[in-house]
Amino acid sequence: MSKEEVLEFSGVVIELLPNAMFRVKLENDHEIIAHTAGRMRKNRIRVLAGDKIMVEMTPYDLTKGRITYRYK
């Protein structure tokens, strides 16, 4: 998938789910399920409930996403 096809949204983690998944509420009030990107896992960046994050989504499935950045 090329980089141009990726949609980016900001949101807040509202719930931690099993298997390193998170329930995220986006700025446009949609709720999605997201997992951490490999680079965040590699650098051991922790994501907790209440954290403000950036999520990448594909236009083909708007219910799942990948957490790419945690705001400080």
Swiss-Prot record:
**Which one Pfam family would you cite for this protein?**
eIF-1a
Q: Which residues form the signal peptide?
A: none
Q: Which domain of life is it from?
A: Bacteria
Identify the residues that the record assigns to the S1-like domain, covering every copy. Answer: 1-72
| Record-level GO cellular component terms | cytosol
**Which PROSITE patterns does the entry link to?**
S1_IF1_TYPE
Q: How does it assemble?
A: Component of the 30S ribosomal translation pre-initiation complex which assembles on the 30S ribosome in the order IF-2 and IF-3, IF-1 and N-formylmethionyl-tRNA(fMet); mRNA recruitment can occur at any time during PIC assembly.
Functionally, this protein is described as follows:
One of the essential components for the initiation of protein synthesis. Stabilizes the binding of IF-2 and IF-3 on the 30S subunit to which N-formylmethionyl-tRNA(fMet) subsequently binds. Helps modulate mRNA selection, yielding the 30S pre-initiation complex (PIC). Upon addition of the 50S ribosomal subunit IF-1, IF-2 and IF-3 are released leaving the mature 70S translation initiation complex.
For this entry, the protein name equals Translation initiation factor IF-1
